[in-house]
Amino acid sequence: MAVSARPARAPRGPDKVKKDKAAQTSGPRQGSQMGKLLGFEWTDVSSWERLVTLLNRPTDPASLAVFRFLFGLMMVLDIPQERGLSSLDRRYLDGLEVCRFPLLDALQPLPLDWMYLVYTIMFLGALGMMLGLCYRISCVLFLLPYWYVFLLDKTSWNNHSYLYGLLAFQLTFVDAHHYWSVDGLLRARKRNAHVPLWNYAVLRGQIFIVYFIAGIKKLDADWVEGYSMEYLSRHWLFSPFKLVLSEEMTSLLVVHWCGLLLDLSAGFLLFFDASRPIGFVFVSYFHCMNSQLFSIGMFPYVMLASSPLFCSPEWPRKLVAHCPKKLQELLPLRTAPQPSTSCMYKRSRARGSQKPGLRHQLSTAFTLLYLLEQLFLPYSHFLTQGYNNWTNGLYGYSWDMMVHSRSHQHVKITYRDGRTGELGYLNPGVFTQSRRWKDHADMLKQYATCLSRLLPKYNVTEPQIYFDIWVSINDRFQQRIFDPRVDIVQAAWSPFQRTPWLQPLLMDLSPWRTKLQEIKSSLDNHTEVVFIADFPGLHLENFVSEDLGNTSIQLLQGEVTVELVAEQKNQTLQEGEKMQLPAGEYHKVYTVSSSPSCYMYIYVNTTEVALEQDLAYLQELKEKVENGSETGPLPPELQPLLEGEVKGGPEPTPLVQTFLRRQQRLQEIERRRNAPFYERFVRFLLRKLFIFRRSFLMTCISLRNLALGRPSLEQLAQEVTYANLRPFEPAGEPSPVNTDSSNPNPPEPDSHPVHSEF
């Protein structure tokens, strides 16, 4: 599969150099159909010795070196951004009371200045990897800090960050510095030398697994039926498809089905020579789209850089051969590679054939074991059952990319003083820098344990912590994910046993999604709906905001009793029945049926509707005055409508101020949308420049602190203020709310107010 490589050969051209004899006899016999298709014969894998010979066959190092350079460059760019160097002081500020989520509780961050040193070592390692300078050492200098930072925070885990660590691990063992490297300039033995075929096989196999396993995971019914990413088709990138398809069909056919087919076929398309051009077109288009659809850092570009690994290894030499001769002097060598001790070469019959050495056998075993391990890990969740929730395993190493989308409607954290019995509530996410803990039992256990250590500082002794978390996955009902009656501080949790306080996903209710969509589509623009499913014996305590002047609850399945707390009244609802809920009051919904209940809140934000009507009136009045159809004078408090801003005179009403702010915001959006390409590109570069500038300055400050000691707090404050300046951005340019592109948990959109009062 991953060993399709032709024997190394020099490119054709006027400066062609003959191959060395060893290389001439090292290639596979490609006379048969199998040899032409796969690059090796059946006899090459018919025994262990022949397999070792095949995987250690001399191969051109050119393509491997190009990937090394590009991957190192991507990591140099990634460290200040997604790895978080630019915002390191916000994450690991000394003395900060924060709950962290490492893989192992014993793994803790170093003091802030030392964390900057760790990131500096990682950055220098990535730079050395890119240049091929002290290559092995550079790979280790990048690899160890990378995995330390990665394992330090489970909330930032994702598939591509895991992939970076795997690729860096592989590059540590392969000979990617045998071409186009500083090491090659300094050591003639390393310069332009063959690499064994397994160097390509392990990298190709890894990329193939990423694509193929991602495709297999997308065979999930939710993905095939179009529920996983149903809102993605609203993006402007899918506008061409919506010329011939509806938005729903674009989501189903283009986003979901084409995404499934691409992941399943991408590895095969890239592997075979005949289909590789088609594969290049599809995967390049796919990754370019992903770079615009998602905030996933360097991942699309790393995958684009990995695609040429499937080409003939000598393709860079062919590219150099077509460059002008004056430019060729600055580019990598075109000459044929020299022999390397890492490879096995065929000798003449008279002298016999070379026997595999221990080094060759170990490298072959490493390749096979590594690829088998990568095939096993995505399906190893039966071993680590404690990390299984509604989806299997810790998110990041299963390649189930974008298969599950979640929305959190309601999160309540209750604490009880173990001595006094006093109850209280915590703001969800207090003492954390993330929100991913809501979906994972292992993180919830860590969070509860951390809260139990912090709350005694606030006069809460022996705290008991209870979580009531409502989640919808792939457009299902909102339902509880954990039992709200269990004290998580004392609850049992093991990485190798099923979590007993995890509530099951109500898969039997999945067919309701079609009906739920029909209900949504039947409502007008001002009416909102929230669908709830709850377990027998549990109840939901809720508060209806005073802004929601028209709120009702309707039962879809099962039986519930609704208690109006202030009125001390109860009403039981049967299937299809509905009742009005008073605004500004608490109520409780008890599930009294023997099976899960399903109901929905239907509400209208009357305050928002009235505001929209008033703003529409002001907009209409403004247009009438501007076109001359309104001849009467405006009251003084409405004069800012024409001027666009407040310029003395009577203070405008709050409504007018709201209208002016909305107008300014809409004008700014329109200006940015219609800005020329160069202006948007410059804005993009300035934002990136700020990230790299702040990363550099804060690193210098911390390294100075380690070397010379910390200065006074006043001087430190001045230095940090200078690092936070944006000297390159034009005046009046609004700064983004959060410049930390490393944050894997951006703020959630506002939840429906029916369930967000806690």
From Swiss-Prot:
It is found in: Endoplasmic reticulum membrane. Residues 23-33 have a biased composition (Polar residues). Its EC number is 4.1.1.90. Keywords: Acetylation, Disulfide bond, Endoplasmic reticulum, Lyase, Membrane, Transmembrane, Transmembrane helix. GO terms for cellular component: endoplasmic reticulum membrane. Residues 12-22, 749-758 have a biased composition (Basic and acidic residues). Residues 82-113, 158-292, 383-758 are lumenal. It catalyses: 4-carboxy-L-glutamyl-[protein] + 2,3-epoxyphylloquinone + H2O + H(+) = phylloquinol + L-glutamyl-[protein] + CO2 + O2. It is a multi-pass membrane protein. The chain crosses the membrane at residues 61-81, 114-134, 137-157, 293-313, 362-382. It holds the Pfam family HTTM. Mediates the vitamin K-dependent carboxylation of glutamate residues to calcium-binding gamma-carboxyglutamate (Gla) residues with the concomitant conversion of the reduced hydroquinone form of vitamin K to vitamin K epoxide. Catalyzes gamma-carboxylation of various proteins, such as blood coagulation factors (F2, F7, F9 and F10), osteocalcin (BGLAP) or matrix Gla protein (MGP). Belongs to the vitamin K-dependent gamma-carboxylase family. Monomer. May interact with CALU. This is Vitamin K-dependent gamma-carboxylase. It comes from Ovis aries (Sheep).
